[in-house]
Amino acid sequence: MKRAVVVFSGGQDSTTCLIQALQHYDDVHCITFDYGQRHRAEIDIARELSLKLGATAHKVLDVGLLNELATSSLTRDSIPVPDYDANAQGIPNTFVPGRNILFLTLASIYAYQVGAEAVITGVCETDFSGYPDCRDEFVKALNQAIVLGIARDIRFETPLMWLNKAETWALADYYQQLDTVRYHTLTCYNGIKGDGCGQCAACHLRANGLAQYQNDSAAVMASLKQKAGLR
């Protein structure tokens, strides 16, 4: 039996990864992390979506220690979430230091326990918002370290790594789940479900990608199929 663990936040990217994983694996587990994030509604949404889409199991882990250590606008109500700024440079204050290091490590331990061969994460270098822990070289390096550390060949899969946001929308549509992703996920940094607040960087990226896909869906779908090896 092919088994995978999806790092699952209930947002656009991880939900799209879950949708795809359910087509390729017999047994799919979701793991969600409660780190005291300001948009805590994502935990309930992740529960709802994992049940709705048919995941085998959904594990929510309390990692509140990350909140104590990592200062970010996503972990501190006192730090305002910035509006989208096309000219912004450097790492944004929405970056949570160490988050993906911790999440992928804990997901690997869980995968070890349930006998999963893969850990799937929705990180993306094409539209990575300046987050260093969304880069391909980081994921591959951590994967190598994990394999050495637990002596188990657990594979990190990053199906969105080289897709832009329009192609990520196309992937959801390919599996006939575009409306599920659009209306039932939470990507917004301000914790607003669906199309979100429309002002933060996450909402801008998501809306811009959807508009690009809707404006030329045939071309975007063709590009997706070529990149992802889909028919």
Curated annotation (Swiss-Prot):
GO molecular function, one term: ligase activity, forming carbon-nitrogen bonds
InterPro entries associated with the record: QueC (IPR018317), Rossmann-like_a/b/a_fold (IPR014729)
Record note on cofactor: Binds 1 zinc ion per subunit.
Pathway annotation from the record: Purine metabolism; 7-cyano-7-deazaguanine biosynthesis
Highest taxon listed in the record's lineage: Bacteria
Entry EC no(s): 6.3.4.20
Protein name: 7-cyano-7-deazaguanine synthase
